[in-house]
A protein has these predicted regions:
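A short glycine-rich beta-strand->turn/loop micro-motif centered on a GG-aromatic cluster
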Residues: 1-2, 68-73, 243
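Acidic, Mg2+-coordinating active-site environments of NTP-dependent enzymes
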Residues: 3-12, 118-257
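A generic helix-loop boundary/linker signal
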Residues: 17-18, 69, 73, 219, ...
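Phosphate-binding loop of NTP-binding sites
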Residues: 23-156, 166-172, 233
């Protein structure tokens, strides 16, 4: 307020706002409304960036033009920065957006109001940021906002091997697609084998069928991340064979395992 008088001479090129961050978010929401195509939102205590990249890769392999979060920009400033790219290029067919939180202040719910998700992917609930949220239960409640904010006709993609995540299925009356390794799920990896080259071989199972898959990444966590991506591909009409073929060409994001 004290600088407002100094800025008056620039009024023809400035917009005054009571809260610059809220105004920035509202601007991004307006750009989203003008674009109005599917949004896949991804959250979890770990693996968000890898799962987001895998999901974007799988969808792009089907010929779709995919907007994805810039770097790990997943908060109230980072998400709008990504979304505003639609103002200069609205030819994207779909957006895969990472949504994070670190405090018990409805962060994810507020992010969802900028870009309401058509598909919400919840990866896991782990004691990350527990110093701010107090308990694993509170972390789960915060992550669950991604499911609660789903569009009525949206789809929740939930990790069946994480009980805190899988219990979120009760929060959405619409479609649920589960994925997992240990527990029975809609999308699964079976007959898993790790080779000496750091690659993972498995049978990919979806409701559409089965196909042999080769993932050039190692570790159970990466299998789960690719199953989340496979579930999204299935939701958008890809065959199991198409999804498995796309996994063969993925690469880990920089500095990610």
């Amino acid at each position: 307020e004290k600088h407002k008088a100094d800025l008056e001479k620039y009024r023809d090129r400035l917009i005054f706002a009571d809260d610059v961050i809220v105004a920035f978010q509202n601007l991004a929401h307006g750009v989203y409304l003008g674009w109005n195509k599917p949004v896949v939102a991804v959250t979890g205590s770990a693996g968000k960036t890898t799962a987001r990249e895998l999901t974007a890769h799988v969808l792009a392999s089907s010929g779709r033009k995919v907007l994805r979060s810039i770097k790990n920009y997943n908060n109230g400033l980072g998400l709008p920065i990504t979304v505003l790219n639609l103002a200069k290029d609205n030819s994207y067919d779909i957006a895969v957006l990472e949504m994070g939180m670190s405090t018990p202040n409805n962060e994810i719910a507020r992010l969802c109001r900028i870009t309401p998700p058509d598909v919400s992917v919840v990866l896991n609930v782990l004691p990350v940021h527990i110093e701010h949220l107090g308990s694993l239960e509170n972390i789960a409640k915060a992550k669950a906002e991604l499911v609660e904010e789903l569009k009525t006709d949206g789809t929740a993609v939930l990790n069946a091997d994480d009980s805190s995540v899988f219990s979120m299925r009760d929060l959405h009356k619409g479609r649920i697609v589960s994925y997992g390794i240990e527990n029975q799920a809609d999308v699964m990896a079976k007959n898993i084998r790790f080779d000496r080259f750091g690659e993972t071989h498995f049978t990919l199972h979806t409701p559409e069928g089965e196909s042999q898959a080769l993932l050039p990444l190692n570790g159970r966590h990466n299998i789960l991340n690719c199953l989340a991506a496979a579930a999204v591909g299935h939701i958008f009409g890809m065959t199991t064979h198409q999804i498995a073929a796309s996994l063969h060409t993925v690469a880990p994001p920089p500095n990610r395992g």
